[in-house]
């Protein structure tokens, strides 16, 4: 049995003990002591000619850019929503609204660092991150190593199991026509 397996088993055992003690549950989902949390995030932005396209904090094109209030990094926006969802803290629009000029042109990295800092303060750490990009262009494969390195650096851990994959919509809808780009992110958090 590995150290991670032992830690997981101990966490599950502790969770079962807490439930069997019939402790009252706090209505704030973030305060419920569960050993693991899973969150899913999604983001989509229309694309326009010119500017630059950032994915996971990496410039992947200087031919197209997202129509967005901030820098429009769909990977980081989906990641923030996944982290917020796992903790039961709402969504990115509640925390960084596009109606607030403070976030106009903001680097999405700030959103990730702010939210993940709060997640860690609440006693959780990221174990796993899985990202799926949906885009006709640009092709993502050449950028995947840099994107993964950027995500790990942003999250402060080389040890996070992270994956980035991409697909197309086979010419269907706005994504398939190259008019938009989208990302899904799934995170698994563990109680520290």
List each language-model region with its residue ranges.
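Short, basic, low-complexity termini and linkers enriched in Ser/Thr/Gly/Pro
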Residues: 1-34, 192
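RNase III-family endoribonuclease catalytic core
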Residues: 32-145, 154-155
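Active-site phosphate/pyrophosphate- and oxyanion-stabilizing loops and adjacent acidic/basic residues
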Residues: 149
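Short acidic capping loops at alpha-helix termini that bridge into adjacent secondary structure
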Residues: 158-161
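Pyridoxal 5′-phosphate
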Residues: 164-168
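Mobile acidic interaction elements
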Residues: 171-173
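C-terminal edge-of-domain segments
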Residues: 176-192
